[in-house]
Regions:
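Helicase motor core with emphasis on the C-terminal RecA-like subdomain
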Residues: 2-12, 16-20, 24-46, 52-57, ...
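C-terminal accessory region of SF2 helicases/translocases
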Residues: 278, 295-296, 304-313, 319-598
């Protein structure tokens, strides 16, 4: 079997051998053991499930929250002749059904699934008929409430295990503290503890913390001093645009990226940066997951992340090609105050959460004992003006209410329109009195999408506009008029956040926030922030050693390239110089060192 793994690696990827602990993980999961693999960014995680998936009978199901990564990996696997597909929110019901049926009948070897899809009745019904070899859980730290990126949807993975008893799980993550490592194995119901850990040390990456009152000037100075592709991380969407404009004014090509942009715009900017058409990407933490660009020379954090896990993962996007790269954190005295304030912003007092829940019911005129299943568009700005709240507090309260089971809050809708024909294909051809724009849009829809007669289907209005030789606005009005004539069902794309009540409304004072949702998570959040502050202020210990220790990895050697190590080296040279002066071995005249002769 071991030789089979290597022959698969060579046949499909062209690599002569495995790296690091890849083979250990592959052999472990292939033998049927639940396995947790800890590998740093760029460590080759995907190989550890793709190779054994091809070596075994059945289908490997890969659970990941990263839709961009899904699409990218499926594309690359298909280019290698490997049967792969994915299920995610952008796909229509009929497309998902087709993918699942293909999987059942052998047309798919590796199936990527977003965690939100696991709970759907359709997926669970079809899953019973799929021969599963093993289940891979990517970004496994998301299942841990002690992790920095907990996602409630990940808890459903344990339910899938009950449907497929005896099927082993491979959990993978690039960021997990010892506490999170234990929690992952417990939450995924590992039959026994089984962890393989690759060193998180990045020998080609120099970690630098630089104290700077004027961070923008320091950022420009650094980018002018060190060439190559770069990512600038900031906390707010507004600042991404400001930083990109500032850099452009300085002659440094830059663009910006955040979760609020249209999908087409995000895709366009990401591709421009990946192709080096622009040098710098200014972004929030919405950018970077699943992005394959190995030659990033520098990651600069203008704003301090709220955990070392987040910092390590974002900084780790530099230098994935093994070449010398830099991770720079710009820090000053104001950052500590901002980080401390984030605790209060992220965990408002329970009384305030209850008040916001109550006012939400007034806002939508929902009576006690009603509302379950209802969805409402949510204008947070209007809500805050009426009830005199800060948006950050409202946003945090809604997330806590979501984790407590009262509602579902989506602040970043997908922004794509959906269409379904209400007439049969033959009836469409008999239609008369269609305007030229309506006729062009109907023709473009029929050419581009095969599922429009059976289900609501996501459409690309820009593509339809190109095919119909119309503007996007003309396409929109044509779709609206077709819907008014009951020819199609049309759900316009919406960027407005929405709220769905997952249970009937109760009195605000009866809202119960569980301890694990508020007290326990707040305590862990405070600990992570304190660790981040300590890292930024600790200028006596090697940066790499500090990071490795946080993730439970002991390392006696220093990196010799971070700001602390370089400062210590200068101190050592100065001490040596002073000693020689004291011992009368050298003299200093006009700042020149002159060695004394015997």
């Amino acid at each position: 079997m071991a030789d089979k793994f290597q022959s698969i690696l060579q046949k499909y990827w062209g690599y002569p051998d495995f790296r690091g602990i890849q083979r250990n993980i592959i052999e472990s999961i292939a033998s049927g053991r639940d396995t947790l693999g800890l590998m740093p960014t760029g460590g080759g995680k995907s190989i550890t499930f793709q190779v054994p998936a091809l070596a075994q009978e059945g289908v490997c199901i890969v659970i990941t929250p990263l839709i961009a990564l899904m699409k990218d990996q499926v594309l690359h696997l298909k280019e290698r002749g490997i049967l792969a597909d994915a299920i995610y929110a952008d796909k229509s019901r009929s497309e998902i059904l087709q993918t699942l049926d293909n999987t059942i009948f052998g047309g798919v070897k590796i199936l990527y699934v977003s965690p939100e899809r696991l709970a759907s009745e359709m997926f669970q019904t079809k899953l019973r008929h799929i021969h599963v070899s093993f289940i891979t859980v990517d970004e496994a730290h998301c299942i841990s409430q002690w992790g920095y990126d907990f996602r409630p949807s990940y808890l459903q993975i344990a339910d899938i295990r009950e449907m497929k008893p005896g099927v082993p799980i491979l959990a993978l993550t690039a960021t997990a503290t010892p506490e999170v490592v234990e929690d992952i194995q417990e939450k995924l119901h590992f039959s026994e503890k089984n962890v393989f850990k690759m060193s998180f040390e990045r020998k080609n990456l120099a970690y630098v913390v630089r104290e700077a009152e004027d961070k923008q000037s320091e950022m420009i100075h650094i980018l002018q001093s060190v060439g190559g592709s770069a990512i600038i991380y900031v906390r707010s969407r507004k600042r991404t645009k400001e930083m990109a404009q500032l850099l452009s004014q300085q002659g440094i090509t830059a663009t910006f990226y955040h979760a609020g942009l249209d999908p087409d715009v995000k895709d366009q900017r990401q591709k421009a940066w990946q192709k080096d058409e622009v040098r710098v990407m200014c972004a929030t933490n919405a950018f970077g997951m699943g992005i394959d660009k190995p030659d990033v020379r520098m990651v600069i954090h203008i704003d301090c992340p709220d955990s070392l896990e987040a910092y390590f993962q974002e900084a780790g996007r530099a230098g994935r090609d093994g070449q010398k790269s830099y991770a720079v954190l710009l820090y000053n005295k104001h950052d500590e105050l901002k980080l401390s304030k984030r605790v209060e912003d992220t965990f408002p007092q329970k009384e305030l959460i209850q008040d916001i829940y109550e006012h939400l019911a007034y806002f939508y005129q929902i009576g006690v004992g009603s509302g379950q299943g209802k969805t409402f568009e949510f204008d947070i700005e209007k809500f805050c003006i009426i009830y005199k709240y800060f948006p950050t507090k409202v946003d945090a309260a809604l997330r806590i209410l979501e984790r407590s089971g009262y509602l579902y809050y989506e602040d970043n809708p997908d922004g794509k329109a959906r269409v379904m024909f209400l007439l049969g294909r033959n009836d469409l051809y008999l239609l008369d009195q269609l305007s030229p724009s309506q006729d062009a849009v109907v023709t473009a829809l029929l050419r581009s999408y095969g599922s429009l007669f059976v289900d609501l289907t996501y459409i690309d209005e820009a593509m339809i506009a190109r095919q119909a030789e119309l503007t996007i606005q003309q396409v929109y009005f044509a779709l609206k008029s077709l819907a008014a004539r009951h020819i199609i069902k049309f759900i316009p794309r919406r960027k407005i956040p929405f709220i769905t009540y997952t249970r009937d409304r109760v009195d605000g004072n009866k809202v119960v926030i569980p301890k694990e949702v508020w007290e326990s998570r707040r305590e862990q959040y405070e600990k992570r922030i304190k660790s981040m502050i300590h890292y930024a202020k600790n200028d006596e210990e090697c940066r790499s050693k500090q990071l490795l220790a946080y993730f439970g990895e002991e390392n006696d050697s220093e990196c010799k390239q971070c700001d602390v190590c370089l400062a210590n080296r200068e101190d050592d040279k100065e001490k040596e110089l002073r000693m020689k002066v004291a011992e009368n071995q050298i003299i200093i005249e006009d700042h020149h060192i002159i060695e004394k002769k015997d």
